[in-house]
Curated annotation (Swiss-Prot):
This is Leucine-rich repeat-containing protein 30. Signal peptide: none annotated. It comes from the Eukaryota. It comes from Mus musculus. The lineage of its organism: Eukaryota, Metazoa, Chordata, Craniata, Vertebrata. LRR repeats lie at residues 47-69, 70-92, 94-115, 116-138, 139-161, 162-184, 186-207, 209-230, 231-253, 261-286. The gene is Lrrc30.
Length: 300
């Protein structure tokens, strides 16, 4: 007991701790700075990447020491209260994965264009109304998630993201799929659910590598025939729309495999649409029955 009291008394007299007031709990990076240690000691060195994480720290600003951690390749600043991403982020040119989801960001600095090694960028759950055209200069980007923001358009230059494979634009304000998206030939995952879409452009057929396409919970009125030409599709989710008819060519999507009811399952998701008769009964009967009906209808 005496030893513990002695330590507590010593801490109370520490001028560095007194400067921080009565705060009882210190994060690892607070303690490192208080003790005068090199912040690089906080870096986690894995087999493939050097990573650094400041998740759920309640931060409104990013600590300046971070911009000196030039080795960092995976940076996780998610679930804080950040309102600004400073231009200094451009110094971290080795970053491969950057997670900024769950903050209060309204914009991104143009200096993101300097992150030439960036492959994965998470911007989910922020307040972004636009993204800078300079982001398209990150030509190695493969995964871009911007769900739950306030976006209604993308820069035309995004067509230059030729290596992009996965794009999540769900829960935004898009009235149509941006034209630049149809230039992303390597795209195998596209999520545009919970937007304001009324149709799917014929250009969807340009996405020949697409395996997963989610457009649930929109106001889509028709199922375009051109979508039937994307024969690589393994999961197609059009739940909760206003679709009344299905194209006769739907049977061309042979990789769908089945009518799916679980959101995570591969297959055709077409529930909660005002399908005209006899389509609801055919859907209930399974994909084989539905395809057989559509084939006969097309050839008779």
């Amino acid at each position: 007991m005496g030893t513990k009291q002695s330590r507590a008394s010593s801490n109370d007299k520490d001028p560095k701790r007194l400067l921080l007031g009565k705060r009882q709990k210190f994060s690892s990076w607070d303690d490192t700075l208080l003790l005068g240690k090199d912040p690089r000691s906080l870096l986690k060195r894995g087999m493939r990447h050097v990573s650094f994480s400041l998740v759920t720290k309640g931060m409104t600003d990013i600590p300046d020491f971070l911009w000196g951690l030039l080795e960092v390749q995976k940076l996780n600043l998610s679930h804080n209260q950040l309102r600004v991403l400073p231009p200094e982020v451009g110094r971290l040119t080795r970053i491969v994965v950057l997670n900024l989801c769950g903050n209060c960001l309204k914009s991104l600095p143009r200096e993101v264009s300097l992150l030439q090694s960036l492959k994965v960028l998470f911007l989910n759950m922020n307040c972004l109304a636009e993204v800078p055209a300079e982001l398209s200069l990150c030509r190695n980007l493969e995964v871009l998630s911007m769900s739950h923001n306030c976006l209604s358009q993308l820069p035309a230059s995004f067509a230059d993201l030729s290596r992009l494979r996965k794009l999540n634009l769900s829960n935004n304000y898009f009235a149509h799929i941006p034209l630049c998206v149809f230039s992303l030939k390597e795209l195998d995952f596209l999520h545009v659910g919970s937007n304001r879409l009324k149709n799917i452009a014929e250009s969807i057929q340009c996405l020949a590598s697409l395996q997963i396409f989610i457009a649930e919970s929109n106001n889509i009125h028709s199922f375009p025939r051109s979508l039937c030409l994307v024969t690589s599709l393994e999961l197609l989710n059009l739940n909760n729309n206003d679709i009344q008819t299905l194209p006769d060519e739907l049977y061309l999507l042979c990789r769908l495999g089945r009518i799916a009811w679980n959101p995570m399952d591969k297959g055709l998701h077409i529930s909660h649409n005002p399908l005209s008769k006899p389509l609801p009964e055919l859907v209930e009967g399974g994909l084989e029955m539905l395809y057989s009906y559509l084939k006969d209808k097309k050839h008779n």
